[in-house]
C-alpha cells in the first residue's frame, strides 16, 4: 500500500507539472503572437487600457504573466503608445479616438501625463476624442479630461479625492520580535528616508515635508490640467476634492466634470454627431491600441524587408 500511494503521488505530481508547463508556455505564446489586424478606411482608435503601459520592455519573459489568474497581461511601451497616437493624428483611416479607461491595465502618473500631452496634440489635428466610462478613477479622469466630450454611465461614479501617500512602519513589530535594525544614516542626511520604517514609528518631519511636496506636485499638475480643459476654477476642484462632493454620476454632471450621462449603446449617436462614419452594417469599426501598434510594426517590417 505504501508503494502504491507513493507511485500515485509521483504520477500525480508529474501530471500536474506537465500541465503547468503546457499552460505556462501557452500563456507566453499568446503574449508573443498576435493576429494580423487590417485597419479599415473609417476606423476609430480605442484606448481602453486593456494593456499595461510600461516605460520599456522587460527582458523577463514572465513579466507579463498574472500568476494570480494565470493569464497574460499584454504590454505596450510608452514609446509605441505615443508613436501610435502621433501616427493616428495624420492617418486618414483613423477618424478619432474613443477613450475608454476601464480595461484594468496599469500606468503610472508620469505615463498618463505624457499620454495626455500626446492626446492634446492629436486634437489639434482636427480629429475628435470622446471619453466614456462606467466609473472614473482619478487617473482615468485626468486623462479623459483632454477629450472633446466626457460621458459617464448614469448609475456609475467618479473618484475625485485628491492625492495622498501612506507608509508602513515596522519598528513596533521589530520590538515585539526583539529585532534590532542596524541603520547607517549620517545626521546630515535626514531626507534619506528609505530606512525610517525600520527604526521609527511615524514619519519624520523631514520626510513628511518632502512627501507633502511630492503629493502636492502630483495634485497640482492634475488639477490644473483638468481646470484648463474643463473650464472649472482650480479653487472649485480643490473644494470638491476636500469635501468629497463628487462620487455619484449626477454629482459629476452637476459640477460640470462630465458632459452627459449615457449608456454605452447610446455612444454611436455621439460618434455620428462628431462626423464619424460607420461601416455598411451601421456599426463602427474600432481598433485597439495594441492592434494599431502591431499594424504599425508590421508596416515598418514590410518596408525594411522591401529595401
Which residues fall in each region the model found?
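Small-residue-centered hinge/linker elements
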Residues: 1-233, 238-242, 246, 272-307
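Short acidic-hydrophobic, aromatic-tinged amphipathic segments that line or gate anion-handling sites
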Residues: 151-152, 258-264
Amino acid at each position: 500500500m505504501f508503494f502504491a500511494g507513493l507511485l500515485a503521488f509521483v504520477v500525480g505530481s508529474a501530471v500536474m507539472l506537465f500541465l503547468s508547463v503546457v499552460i505556462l508556455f501557452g500563456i507566453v505564446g499568446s503574449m508573443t503572437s498576435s493576429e494580423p489586424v487590417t485597419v479599415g478606411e473609417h476606423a476609430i482608435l480605442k484606448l481602453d487600457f486593456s494593456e499595461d503601459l510600461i516605460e520599456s520592455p522587460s527582458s523577463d519573459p514572465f513579466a507579463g504573466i498574472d500568476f494570480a489568474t494565470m493569464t497574460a497581461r499584454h504590454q505596450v511601451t510608452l514609446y509605441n503608445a505615443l508613436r501610435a497616437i502621433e501616427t493616428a493624428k495624420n492617418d486618414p483611416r483613423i477618424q478619432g479616438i474613443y477613450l475608454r479607461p476601464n480595461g484594468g491595465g496599469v500606468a503610472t502618473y508620469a505615463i498618463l501625463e505624457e499620454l495626455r500631452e500626446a492626446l492634446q496634440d492629436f486634437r489639434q489635428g482636427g480629429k475628435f476624442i470622446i471619453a466614456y466610462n462606467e466609473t472614473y478613477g482619478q487617473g482615468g479622469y485626468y486623462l479623459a479630461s483632454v477629450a472633446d466630450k466626457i460621458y459617464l454611465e448614469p448609475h456609475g461614479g467618479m473618484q475625485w479625492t485628491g492625492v495622498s501617500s501612506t507608509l508602513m512602519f515596522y519598528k513596533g513589530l521589530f520590538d515585539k520580535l526583539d529585532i534590532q535594525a542596524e541603520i547607517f544614516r549620517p545626521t546630515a542626511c535626514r531626507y534619506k528616508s528609505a530606512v525610517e520604517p525600520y527604526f521609527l514609528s511615524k514619519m519624520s518631519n523631514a520626510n513628511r515635508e518632502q512627501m507633502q511636496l511630492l503629493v502636492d506636485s502630483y495634485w497640482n499638475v492634475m488639477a490644473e490640467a483638468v481646470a484648463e480643459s474643463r473650464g472649472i476654477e482650480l479653487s472649485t476642484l480643490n473644494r470638491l476634492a476636500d469635501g468629497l462632493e463628487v462620487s455619484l454620476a449626477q454629482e459629476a454632471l452637476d459640477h460640470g466634470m462630465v458632459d452627459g450621462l449615457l449608456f454605452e449603446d447610446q455612444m454611436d449617436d455621439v460618434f455620428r454627431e462628431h462626423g464619424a462614419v460607420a461601416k455598411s452594417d451601421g456599426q463602427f469599426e474600432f481598433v485597439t491600441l495594441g492592434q494599431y501598434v502591431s499594424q504599425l510594426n508590421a508596416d515598418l517590417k514590410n518596408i525594411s524587408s522591401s529595401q
